């Protein structure tokens, strides 16, 4: 640490008690409120306040966002004609009214490209500036090659590395964390992150428990270096493979290949044990968010924009209630998009940004939960 003596006096003046640690806890003040944190959080607070400067420290975060939704819209009224359901039943239980459905001519990589171009334009970068591409998806164009490689070709990012991330609905959260830390480590300057899905081809349109939920779309972001103290402040990624069977596609790989029997029995489609998924989602999204806020040295009251995975409205509201996030500090679009899995947080974030709801210096919290089971949270100070 540079200028340790001078920094010590500055720390003491701004963070009373930080100079004399007792029981590995520090007391500091923000907006006139006394707060106490453990020693693991102190570095995040000092960096954020501009009091701690490490040699070769890089800061990284989102420079621009974009999203894309296919033109076709499927309404609840349309679904009433397909399965035994009703608009009232769907809205009451999920909050969903419409969802976008990809055309037969569109693949996941195509949705990625549309969203990526928006994000690159917003970030002021070109295809030549992109050093690496991360695509989070559960509905890739192929098993191999990766969807990220197809996107690399379609965008003309000729010197970029590329790979897919398979973390279900948590994929965008995972990708933002991985990309930000790759930039912080000095590996790359600009990384394109995309969460994209065409789940309409993976649901059984005769199963009303799943076909009413999912939609297609893509959300993208360009990750790069930010000003000191801005960008990703902290992240947390978790998983529990022992519960993987409550949300899966049984016949989708070498453990259970696609056969005529698997097709006839419906095992090639999304299978979900709704009540168990609901309980796990609320528990883990709440816990990972609180853990990440602590890592970042940020209180719940400091949150300016909270975006949770848009699974269904009941889950979103349960998370918000647990975290005591007011409605005007949230962005919810599940009513218009349905559950777009890895795309949902990216789509919601871009909408919030373009609506002017996310401003320079705002604390933005992204949290998600998905198949795996996986979960995660990113806390950032917006550029």
What are these regions (language model features)?
Residues 347-367, 373, 379-383:
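Catalytic phosphate/nucleotide-handling subdomain of diverse soluble enzymes
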Residues 67-68, 136-141, 167-170, 195-200, ...:
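Acidic, glycine-rich active-site loops and adjacent beta-strand->loop/helix elements
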Residues 89-110, 137-191, 321-349:
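Conserved catalytic cysteine-centered active-site region
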Residues 53-104, 207-279, 283, 287, ...:
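Condensing-enzyme catalytic core mediating Claisen C-C bond formation in acyl metabolism
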Residues 31-53:
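Short, Lys/Arg-enriched N-terminal segments with co-localized hydrophobic residues
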Residues 115-131, 288-302, 352-357:
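Phosphate/pyrophosphate-binding loops at sites that engage ATP/ADP/AMP, CoA/4′-phosphopantetheine
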Residues 184-218:
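Flexible, glycine-rich active-site loops centered on histidine and acidic residues
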């Amino acid at each position: 640490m540079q200028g340790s003596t001078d920094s010590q006096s500055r720390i003491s003046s701004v963070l009373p008690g930080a100079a004399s640690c007792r029981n590995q806890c520090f007391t500091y003040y923000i907006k006139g409120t006394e707060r106490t944190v453990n020693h693991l959080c102190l570095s995040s607070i000092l960096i954020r306040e501009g009091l701690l400067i490490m040699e070769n420290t890089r800061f990284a975060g989102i420079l621009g966002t974009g999203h894309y939704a296919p033109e076709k819209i499927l309404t609840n009224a349309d679904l009433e004609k397909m399965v035994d359901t009703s608009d009232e039943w769907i809205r009451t239980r999920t909050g969903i009214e419409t969802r976008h459905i990809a055309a037969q001519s569109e693949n996941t990589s195509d949705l990625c490209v549309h969203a990526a171009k928006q994000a690159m334009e917003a970030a002021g970068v070109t295809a030549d500036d992109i050093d690496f591409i991360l695509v989070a998806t559960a509905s890739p164009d192929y098993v191999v090659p990766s969807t990220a490689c197809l996107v690399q070709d379609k965008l003309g990012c000729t010197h970029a590395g590329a790979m897919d991330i398979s973390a279900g609905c948590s994929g965008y959260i995972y990708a933002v964390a991985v990309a930000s830390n790759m930039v912080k480590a000095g590996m790359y300057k600009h990384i394109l992150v995309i969460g994209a899905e065409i789940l309409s081809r993976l649901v059984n349109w005769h199963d009303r428990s799943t076909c009413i939920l999912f939609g297609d779309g893509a959300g993208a972001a360009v990750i790069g270096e930010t000003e000191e103290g801005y960008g990703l402040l902290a992240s947390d990624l978790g998983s529990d493979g022992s519960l993987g069977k409550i949300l899966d596609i049984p016949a989708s790989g070498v453990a259970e290949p696609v056969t005529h029997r698997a097709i006839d029995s419906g095992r090639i489609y999304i299978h979900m044990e709704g009540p168990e998924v609901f309980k796990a989602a609320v528990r883990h999204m709440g816990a990972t968010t609180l853990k990440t806020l602590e890592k970042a040295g940020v209180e719940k009251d400091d949150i300016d924009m909270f975006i949770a995975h848009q699974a269904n409205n009941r889950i979103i509201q349960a998370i918000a209630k647990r975290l005591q996030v007011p409605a005007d500090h949230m962005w919810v679009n599940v009513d218009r998009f349905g559950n777009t899995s890895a795309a949902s947080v990216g789509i919601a974030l871009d909408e919030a940004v373009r609506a002017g709801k996310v401003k320079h210096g705002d604390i933005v919290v992204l949290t998600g939960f998905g198949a795996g089971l996986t979960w995660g949270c990113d806390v950032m100070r917006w550029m």
